[in-house]
């Protein structure tokens, strides 16, 4: 019974009808373990596993912060002063913090959050702790607002005071946005990584090499898929297409194998029939070679392989996809700290910009919804070629 109540308490963060200890105990008596598993599956699938994970993490942080900062649990609905306190504790002027320890998040609050593992340990003085990333603060405020709506409440997150405080705090914090991957994995870099998947002269590529090659090629060629999309890819999402010409304007050009991937729900898109991307050429060959070598005919496409080379039934995790990229970078003599799986996504758009592919064309493959976000990669790629920077020679 206690385990069922605990599971329902976890669900209460996202399903308001389950909120409250009395309600949880009542439902624990009525619901079977299978019923609770079904509810958890609906909650996870209905909003996406990553979104659910982020919301749960944000809820835990907000609860922990409020308890430490005010001595009380989160109130529902949240008053404006509490939201303003949250902003002040997470976005501040780093220079003023150096001279005034009471500026920004108080030291005792930071230490308590570190002790609860809700905040990273600061190796140096707490005065040197940087403010939070504005995007993180904005996401947590959005999660807080979402939790209000799911409880049938209206939070004051759109109040003029909150919007003004957030806008000014972001300006004062002056923390530049950093890329998820310091360096983009462009086509040249990708070729270097692929060479590490060729195996040695004696044995050739092993099963791990074949898998990693397919992960890298599919991750890049499909528009720079997110690591969660690669780890969640299922055989049923693949459709093998007729061979297509290398040059679509020349029907007599070389014919290449093709396949389409139905992406389903992604971070920015709901599942729909047109949410598909096309793969052509050696990427399709690499994907087929992996499926043939692994004898995978259904379920997860990319799966774990143990240290003895045995294929597992479980899918790769998003973290495993990231580890594959870093491992191949290390084998290629590159610094793994400079790269992550997101480098495949940024690298795809950067490469498209370098080849003067229209941004709208690239976005159809990458499935970016924001022109501004996609344009940032095009701007970075074109910076070194700008004529305006060469006016004085």
Question: What would you call each of these model-derived segments?
Answer:
Residues 1-19, 392-393:
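C-terminal secondary-structure termini that scaffold catalytic or DNA-interacting sites
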Residues 156-197, 265-267, 306-312:
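Flexible interdomain linker/hinge and immediately adjacent N-terminus
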Residues 366-391:
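Catalytic-site neighborhood detector that most strongly recognizes the C-terminal catalytic loop/helix
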Residues 219-257, 360-364:
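Short, charged phosphate-coordinating catalytic segments
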Residues 191-227:
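Basic, Lys/Arg- and aromatic-enriched nucleic-acid-binding interface segment
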Residues 37-52, 59-179, 199-204:
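N-terminal core-binding DNA-recognition domain of tyrosine recombinases/integrases
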Residues 247-311, 319-328:
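Basic, alpha-helical nucleic-acid-contacting "clamp/cap" segments
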Residues 217, 344-369, 385:
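C-terminal catalytic core of tyrosine-transesterase DNA break-rejoin enzymes
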